Amino acid sequence: LVYDNFDRETHVKPAPANAERVFVGLDDAGSSTTSIGLWFVIGNRKWKKREVYRAGMKNSEKMDTIQAWAREFDIEGVVVDSAAYAIKQDLMAAGFNVINSPKGTEEGIKIVRNELDPGPDGAPLILIDPACKRTIAELETYEYDPKTGKPVKANDHACDEMRYLVVHLATPVPRAFDLDGL
């Protein structure tokens, strides 16, 4: 398994009602399955609170989902599959802060695996609400192809969406050059 350190008992916990920061992750596979996740961030901990996981979603349906969440929560950004041009245009037109998904599947998987491990307080940095059933199912079945050693590109949409979000949050934001400090 790609995430063999995922354990239901450890990682599946009810999400809190509120968060310090709120993000949406989106793996948009066009006519294939789309995974949209509502993520709460508290300190360094990421908590997937809700999910929509469906094949054949129109962009208008994706937008309806994200806009409904935005009426409930102050969404800081939507981390989107970098290849999903059309939905990114719709999100920007609606005023959302659109963040391209980071590149590098293997490096991203390493980051997610590290954050599934126990943190300094003994708890993992990634938690999943029990309502996110598709994400849980994918985490328990996402595997490497024994012939290629690469992740199998099937039933991986929630895992990809999670990876985009987690890697974005794990990537330090470059600081502007400060001339006053010279």
Q: Which residue ranges define each predicted feature?
A:
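Short acidic, Gly/Ser-rich segments with clustered Asp/Glu that frequently serve as metal-coordination loops
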Residues: 24-35
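Stable alpha-helical structural segments in soluble proteins, enriched in small hydrophobic residues
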Residues: 157-169
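Alpha-helical architecture
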Residues: 25, 136, 154-158
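Residue-level detector of short, conserved catalytic/binding motifs and their immediate flanks
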Residues: 34, 76, 159
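Short beta-strand scaffold segments in enzyme catalytic cores
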Residues: 34-40, 163
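ATPase catalytic-site recognition across NTP-hydrolyzing enzymes
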Residues: 1-26
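Generic detector of well-ordered alpha-helical packing
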Residues: 28-29, 82, 157
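Mg2+-dependent endonuclease catalytic cores in nucleic-acid-processing enzymes, primarily RNase H-like
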Residues: 42-153, 172, 176-182
